[in-house]
Regions:
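Conserved beta-strand->loop/alpha-helix structural units within folded catalytic cores of enzymes
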Residues: 138-141
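Small-residue hinge/turn detector
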Residues: 134-135
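An N-terminal alpha-helical hairpin/helix-loop-helix interaction module that forms a charged
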Residues: 1-131, 147-218
């Protein structure tokens, strides 16, 4: 019996304009991991010292997120989740000192730890605080710290995952992201020989599906 998902992955890998060749194999991609890690270390240090400030614009976080948003099409618009929305007063990590410290603790834990258990535990801790406007878009920061543990996240990736698996994952909730993450890990294990232990590869496949470049197998 033909494995339609395997055929899709092979076609995607051979597509010069797909995310596998245009982003995942891009030489600059790996260099950006180092600079993003250093940038997040600065964010953590500033929050701990009380010098981060109360605005996104001009902050060390803006610098990091901007460099992520420049990671070609898969991360285009990654900054939207962190932009201050004054009418909604979200994400509530700029004006609320306790929330800002909790956000810094999440990043600090994920910078220092190396295990899936610690990363997921840190996510549960930040989720328990129910900080307005601070959802799984943060996973795009964590991906650059732990690419084998945390898949990237955006609307197109969720759409692609739902199309490929028949799931109904929703945006904006950490528990939904973590459930999708488990499904992504299983998919990645099944097709590991064609993908990578770096979850950016399967994230790119799902992005291309969700953005309409490919149609999910029936």
């Amino acid at each position: 019996m033909t494995d339609l998902i395997r055929d899709l992955i092979l076609r995607w890998r051979d597509d010069p304009a797909g995310t596998y060749q245009s982003w995942f194999l891009w030489d600059e991609r790996l260099k950006n991991f180092r600079s993003i890690r250093r940038g997040l270390q600065l964010v953590v240090a500033e929050i701990a010292a009380g010098t981060f400030g109360v605005a996104y614009r001009g902050s060390s976080l803006e610098t990091v997120v901007h460099s992520i948003a420049e990671q070609r099409q898969i991360f285009k618009g990654a900054d939207h989740a962190f932009l201050w929305k004054p009418k909604l007063r979200i994400p509530d990590i700029y004006e609320n000192p306790a929330n800002q410290k909790a956000f810094g603790q999440l990043l600090d834990t994920c910078l220092c730890c190396n295990t899936e258990e610690h990363v997921v535990s840190a996510i549960h801790a930040i989720d328990a605080r129910k900080i307005k406007g601070l959802g799984p878009a943060v996973a795009n920061l964590l991906y650059f710290l732990h690419p084998t543990i945390m898949p990237p996240f955006n609307t197109a990736i969720v759409k692609g995952y739902n199309a490929l698996t028949g799931s109904k994952v929703k945006l904006g909730r950490w528990e939904e992201y973590l459930a999708m993450r488990q499904g992504i890990l299983k998919l990645n294990a099944t097709y590991r020989v064609l993908l990578s232990n770096d979850l950016g590869a399967i994230g790119g496949l799902l992005f291309d599906l969700g953005s309409g470049r490919y149609t999910a197998p029936p």
